[in-house]
Amino acid sequence: MNTVRVTFLLVFVLAVSLGQADKDENRMEMQEKTEQGKSYLDFAENLLLQKLEELEAKLLEEDSKESRNSRQKRCIGEGVPCDENDPRCCSGLVCLKPTLHGIWYKSYYCYRK
């Protein structure tokens, strides 16, 4: 009976001491993995950022191209005052200073080309 207790106590002490060593070893492994994970996450983040920038560039390029089927929006018609620096005349019109009529308004108007 006494030997059983001693054996049990010895096994218990060995299990606890080896468990602590494993715990410290596991902690070190976890630190290494988190450091590797951070570098992997940084790499993945940079890759995702590059893909998003490429996608954004494609979308902006598509927006800048005019479709034949799309109509022109928010343009100024013929004979309507326009801003010299930011003309928004419809296609086929140009923002020019008036010739005879409208001189007294001191403004630019949309005229046909």
Swiss-Prot record:
Places the protein is found: Secreted
Signal peptide boundaries: 1-21
Keyword Methyltransferase on entry: no
GO cellular component, one term: extracellular region
Region (Disordered): 61-82
Keywords tagged on the record: Disulfide bond, Ion channel impairing toxin, Knottin, Secreted, Signal, Toxin
UniProt propeptide residues: 22-74
Main subcellular location: secreted
Biological role: Probable ion channel inhibitor.
Family (UniProt): Belongs to the neurotoxin 14 (magi-1) family. 01 (HNTX-16) subfamily.
Domain notes: The presence of a 'disulfide through disulfide knot' structurally defines this protein as a knottin.
Name assigned to this protein: U11-theraphotoxin-Hhn1f
